[in-house]
């Protein structure tokens, strides 16, 4: 089987500086990581909060869009539904950590056999509750977070 790697289990993507209120993604460092994962044919995924950086927000979102691709997925990590939807409809792969919404999504899925959906002006998006948080599963079995350009927002409960 193919290697499977989650980057930055703690921390975030490489930045040009690490001053707390200013984190600009270091594209050069990110590119080196990408090339290393390609050499080893590794399915790689990670999460970032660097879109929250007030000063470098747009730069960081563009850097994510530029570097996130098949087998190298950078998930935009959110806590608020409105932000999750905004980034999803802007073409990003998105995860949200929201225990209340997670519990609703799991309940809906168990009761109806269908994924809970969020309806918005821009369209409808399905929620995928993290399998490892409510089923006998794990990241290596599921791999949903490593799917590029996916049609769902993945939802976690706080952990």
Spans of features found by a protein language model:
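Class I S-adenosyl-L-methionine
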Residues: 1-159
